[in-house]
């Protein structure tokens, strides 16, 4: 054990990390627990696409805290780190780096192989940087054996999983309308789009379509005018009422428009802005059912020759029923383009309508006069065309939310394309039931998860990209039959090309392989790659190379992952193993700035974890992030709260330094024999630290990390530093071998060692540093090789409750002193406490006297002047009009007598039964008394002062100032000094006491090394001008 000085947490971090690295501590801990019970954790993989942000840091700190806790419980923790390395996040970054604007550029400018190489290089480079950032936070994970989806064995597991899905008839290829990114030129799954809706300003267009066999018009509303050239149907709700609106124009002409009756006024109000309408009226109202089957003339028939061909097909350009039609806006008639919307697609399929989606992968039209034009660039031109044909009812703008690409942030299109799907709809009910068996933290996430899954459709797993796991599906060019390959060995066996290097099965190498179909035709691989969420969904078993289900005992990610990663891994496990892949799942919130804004470069409010740890050290950030609020709530990052956390840890360090330095001074060697001599306050802190340990273990098991850290903070600040250290400070000044001193040291030693064992998961650096200084030769070399234990025999609930009362009393005395401006250095002659706590006060009254600086404690009811106040609210409920008579009866009894009578229960006066709740007793307190309420009654403090009180207070004033001067002079604890005091005359007894407290000798003359002058003002307004000289005792 060595002397301890002040701490710099950042320097401490570095020192401890160097120690761990030199001693290979992480691996030693792993080896130590190798035969312990297994604890399986799956790391939700971050994308290797840049530096970590505060949310990523929070995520890894949560994981590291839980896993460190499990290690000190003796578990053999499977803790592989994981990385997301495929997909659009990486591709978009590489495209930006090489100024690539399209997939065509990839193939013509640098080539597929070079692009794949650059993606791999980018991912690996950022992996190394991000790993260093995680390690800087003190994170212990198995980074050496981290799972990487770009490795062949992991990719093969994706193939094996997909073959299992195929064998279970859960894999299908189908033409469906879904999300399409025109910038990335690929389809997206619905779970990738959740949370990616942004507010946009789009056209709001009302259009009229002329009915084929009459001069009447149906009206529709759309925010995507560009889809009108692809219109195939119009939907109505058969149950709604539709009005035939006679519209008269200023030029004397008239038309009939068909609009849902409830929306007529809204639509006509808009129509009047763009048309010279003189008046309108409803001529008749019909049910939507009567409109079904009516044919209309496509509004852009002349501009799109393809529509002229479609017009010859039965049911095309026809009004059909649709349950999705509502009256929440629009016209009650819905424009339907089966190539550009899920509802539209399903309606079209139901009525055998061709799926017409005339746009290419870049979102440009392939038919009509707008051929070659990007869809969003068509809007104004389509509107102008409708105006020229007198078919526009109204044109405006509307703000609404619209889905965007989750990586490049481009507005998405709804487009019908052929894709590969996992048929989740067949097993959705099983997924929901399995999800209910998971231990969700917090428990309400279960409802959110189940509700989210209930709305999912089949999973679109194919992506028209490059950097990903290639779909292991080969399709025959002759008969269209397809086969799913489940491993590289199977592919080698079936391959026509035997010389292709398959050590890496990314594109384009795997595309060179052809198979022979049973019909004799050539089979080529479908060019698509798997959804990157499929990659991470494989993690529970692919990360450990197992084809058997191994349920994770703990996973945690941010709240955006509830229907993303939590879902993707569950869905794949359900497909392959018919079960969920995790037992306990914790959701955490997002990190925001101090005002609650999302952090972003544009707002300039991003907080870098590296910058924070450089300023504060990793442990301060770790403790702050886990204690700022409940983990599942969004966290508003605050530097002032970081300062408070640092201050709290500094308080712990100072308490440790105080303890260690005195122990070193007295050559203290820990020995459990000293526990035989513990005092009440020692027994209390021993009980408290084990109670805290118990609470911490319970909280970490859940895990409720806020409960864990709040318990630690409260113990450090209130129990240990502000209470126990104060109680035993005087014992550290006793003779070297005094048993009271030794038992205090033994208690301090035990408490600090136990405390850092509890804190080690959240403050690993600080805990290790203290442990290294305090450990004895027979102890393990690292704190993380110790097991966290709870000594239940130390726990004494009665003692803790009694001490809590004593602390309340002391706090009340301090409040009373503040009220009376009566500083703690001046003794109080007497306090009066209620008799109901006599037993507790008789046992521990000495603590009240020491900590409150009180000379005498009196246990009795305070004898002030008692007055009675009737409780009119309660009396009114019972006695109503008799209340005045009851009040008179109450006032007829002396207050002291009434109070005594009511102690026994109800009391009858003038035929009225008086209950305790009918009255309130108040005590009038004399000027020399201050009363303060606490949970068991009131503390009454006598604030009268006499000469003895003043002298004792002045003694403390002088001691404090000499101690302050010693600190200024940087003197060792035990270093003797000579003191000369002027301005106050003390008796020899008082001078002897001061000398003992400050390690000094009072002398008449000295060669001053340091002089200070003060003016001391006592509570009774006396003033003393003093001068103190100190000479080092050479």
Swiss-Prot record:
Q: Which residues form the signal peptide?
A: none
Enzyme Commission identifier(s): 6.1.1.5
Motif 'KMSKS' region: list the residue ranges. Answer: 598-602
Pfam families in UniProt: Anticodon_1, DUF5915, tRNA-synt_1
Q: Which cofactor does it need?
A: Zn(2+)
Presence of keyword Aminoacyl-tRNA synthetase: yes
Predominant localisation class: cytoplasm
**Subcellular location as annotated:** Cytoplasm
UniProt keyword annotations, A-Z = Aminoacyl-tRNA synthetase, ATP-binding, Cytoplasm, Ligase, Metal-binding, Nucleotide-binding, Protein biosynthesis, Zinc
Annotated InterPro entries? aa-tRNA-synth_I_CS, aa-tRNA-synth_Ia, Anticodon_Ile_ABEc, Ile-tRNA-ligase, Ile-tRNA-ligase_type2, M/V/L/I-tRNA-synth_anticd-bd, Rossmann-like_a/b/a_fold, tRNAsynth_Ia_anticodon-bd
Drop me one GO molecular function for this one.
isoleucine-tRNA ligase activity
The record's Gene Ontology biological-process terms are:
isoleucyl-tRNA aminoacylation
Q: Name one GO cellular component term.
A: cytoplasm
Domain free text = IleRS has two distinct active sites: one for aminoacylation and one for editing. The misactivated valine is translocated from the active site to the editing site, which sterically excludes the correctly activated isoleucine. The single editing site contains two valyl binding pockets, one specific for each substrate (Val-AMP or Val-tRNA(Ile)).
Q: Tell me the protein family, please.
A: Belongs to the class-I aminoacyl-tRNA synthetase family. IleS type 2 subfamily.
Classification via NCBIfam families: ileS
Record text on subunit structure and interactions:
Monomer.
Name recorded for this polypeptide: Isoleucine--tRNA ligase
Q: Which organism was this protein described from? A: Methanococcus maripaludis (strain DSM 14266 / JCM 13030 / NBRC 101832 / S2 / LL)
What is the gene called?
ileS
């Amino acid at each position: 054990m060595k002397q301890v000085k002040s701490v710099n947490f950042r320097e401490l971090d570095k020192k401890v990390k160097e120690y761990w690295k030199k001693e290979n501590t992480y691996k030693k801990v792993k080896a130590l627990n190798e035969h312990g019970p297994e604890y399986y954790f799956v790391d939700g993989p971050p994308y290797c696409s840049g530096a970590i942000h505060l949310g990523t840091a929070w995520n890894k700190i949560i994981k590291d805290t839980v896993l460190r806790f499990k290690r000190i419980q003796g578990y053999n923790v499977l803790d592989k780190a994981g990385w997301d390395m495929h997909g659009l996040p990486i591709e978009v970054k590489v495209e930006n780096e090489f100024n690539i604007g399209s997939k065509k550029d990839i193939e013509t400018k640098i080539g597929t192989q070079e692009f794949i190489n650059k993606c791999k290089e980018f991912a690996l480079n950022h992996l190394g940087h991000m790993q260093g950032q995680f390690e800087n936070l003190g994170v212990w994970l198995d980074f050496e054996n981290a799972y990487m989806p770009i490795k062949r064995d992991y990719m093969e597991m994706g193939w094996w999983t997909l073959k299992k899905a195929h064998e279970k008839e859960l894999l299908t290829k189908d033409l469906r309308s879904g999300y399409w990114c025109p910038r990335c030129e690929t389809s997206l799954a619905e779970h990738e789009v959740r949370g990616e809706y942004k507010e946009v300003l789009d056209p709001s267009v009302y259009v009229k379509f002329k009915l084929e066999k009459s001069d009447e018009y149906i009206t529709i509303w759309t925010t995507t005018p560009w889809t009108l050239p692809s219109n195939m149907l119009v939907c109505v709700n058969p149950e709604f009422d539709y009005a035939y609106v006679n519209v008269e124009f200023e030029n004397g002409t008239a038309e009939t428009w068909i609009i849902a009756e409830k929306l007529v006024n809204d639509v006509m109000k808009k129509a009047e802005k763009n048309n010279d309408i003189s008046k309108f009226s409803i001529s008749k109202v019909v049910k939507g059912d009567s409109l079904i089957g009516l044919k209309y003339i496509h509004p852009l028939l002349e501009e799109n020759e393809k529509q002229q061909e479609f017009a010859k097909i039965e049911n095309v350009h026809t009004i059909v029923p649709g349950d999705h039609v509502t009256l929440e806006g629009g016209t009650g008639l819905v424009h339907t383009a089966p190539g550009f919307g899920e509802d539209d697609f399903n309606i079209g399929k139901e009525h055998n309508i061709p799926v017409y989606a005339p746009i290419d992968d870049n979102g440009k039209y392939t038919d009509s006069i707008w051929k070659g034009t990007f869809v969003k660039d068509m809007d104004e031109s389509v509107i102008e065309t409708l105006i020229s044909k007198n078919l526009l009812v109204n044109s405006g703008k509307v703000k609404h939310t619209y889905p965007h690409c989750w990586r490049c942030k481009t507005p998405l299109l709804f487009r019908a394309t052929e894709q590969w799907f996992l048929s989740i709809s067949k097993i959705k009910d099983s997924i929901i039931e399995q999800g209910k068996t998971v231990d969700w933290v917090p428990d309400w996430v279960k409802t959110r998860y189940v509700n989210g899954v209930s709305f999912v459709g089949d999973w679109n797993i194919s992506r028209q990209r490059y950097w990903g796991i290639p779909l292991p599906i080969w399709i025959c060019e002759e008969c269209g039959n397809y086969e799913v390959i489940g491993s590289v060995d199977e592919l080698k066996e079936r391959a026509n090309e035997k010389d292709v290097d398959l050590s890496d099965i990314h594109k384009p190498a795997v595309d060179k392989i052809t198979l022979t179909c049973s019909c004799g035709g050539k089979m080529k691989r479908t060019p698509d790659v798997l959804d990157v969420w499929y990659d991470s969904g494989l993690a529970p078993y692919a990360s450990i190379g197992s084809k058997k289900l191994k349920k994770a005992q703990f996973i945690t990610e941010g709240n955006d992952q509830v229907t993303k990663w939590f879902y993707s891994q569950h869905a794949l496990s359900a497909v392959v193993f018919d079960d969920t892949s995790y037992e306990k799942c914790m959701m955490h919130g997002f990190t925001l700035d101090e005002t609650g804004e999302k952090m972003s470069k544009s707002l300039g409010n991003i907080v870098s974890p590296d910058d924070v740890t450089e300023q504060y050290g990793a442990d301060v950030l770790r403790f702050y992030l886990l204690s700022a609020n409940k983990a599942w709530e969004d966290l508003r990052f605050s530097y002032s709260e970081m300062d408070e956390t640092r201050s709290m840890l500094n308080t712990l360090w100072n308490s440790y330094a105080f303890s260690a330095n005195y122990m070193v001074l007295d050559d203290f060697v820990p020995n459990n024999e000293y526990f035989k001599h513990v005092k009440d306050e020692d027994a209390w802190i021993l009980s408290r630290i084990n109670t805290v340990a118990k609470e911490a273990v319970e909280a970490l098991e859940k895990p409720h990390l806020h409960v864990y850290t709040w318990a630690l903070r409260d113990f450090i600040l209130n129990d240990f530093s502000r209470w126990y250290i104060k109680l035993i400070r005087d014992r550290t000044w006793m003779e070297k071998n005094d048993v009271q001193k030794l038992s205090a040291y033994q208690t301090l030693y035990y408490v600090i060692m136990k405390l850092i064992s509890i804190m080690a998961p959240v403050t690993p650096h600080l805990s290790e540093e203290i442990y290294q200084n305090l450990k004895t030769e027979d102890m393990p070399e690292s704190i993380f090789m110790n097991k966290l234990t709870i000594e239940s025999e130390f726990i004494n609930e009665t003692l803790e409750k009694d001490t809590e009362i004593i602390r309340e009393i002391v706090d009340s005395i301090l409040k009373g002193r503040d009220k009376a401006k009566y500083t703690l250095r001046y003794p109080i002659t007497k306090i009066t406490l209620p008799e109901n706590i006599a037993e507790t006060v008789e046992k521990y009254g000495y603590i009240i006297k020491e900590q409150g600086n009180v000379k005498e404690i009196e246990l009795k009811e305070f004898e002030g002047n008692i007055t009675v106040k009737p409780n009119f609210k309660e009396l009114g409920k019972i006695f109503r009009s008799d209340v005045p008579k009851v009040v008179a009866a109450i006032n007829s009894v002396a207050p002291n007598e009434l109070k005594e009578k009511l102690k026994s229960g109800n009391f009858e006066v003038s035929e009225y039964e008086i209950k305790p709740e009918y009255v309130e007793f108040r005590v009038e307190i004399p000027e020399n008394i201050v009363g303060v309420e606490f949970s068991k009654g009131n503390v009454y403090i006598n604030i009268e002062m006499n000469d003895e009180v003043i002298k004792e207070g002045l003694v403390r004033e002088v001691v404090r100032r000499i101690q302050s001067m010693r600190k200024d002079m940087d003197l060792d604890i035990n270093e003797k000094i000579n003191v000369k005091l002027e301005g106050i005359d003390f008796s020899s007894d008082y001078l002897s006491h001061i000398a003992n407290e400050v390690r000094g000798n009072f002398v008449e003359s000295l060669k001053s090394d340091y002089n200070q002058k003060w003016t001391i003002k006592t509570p009774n307004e006396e003033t003393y001008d003093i001068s103190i000289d100190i000479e080092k005792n050479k």
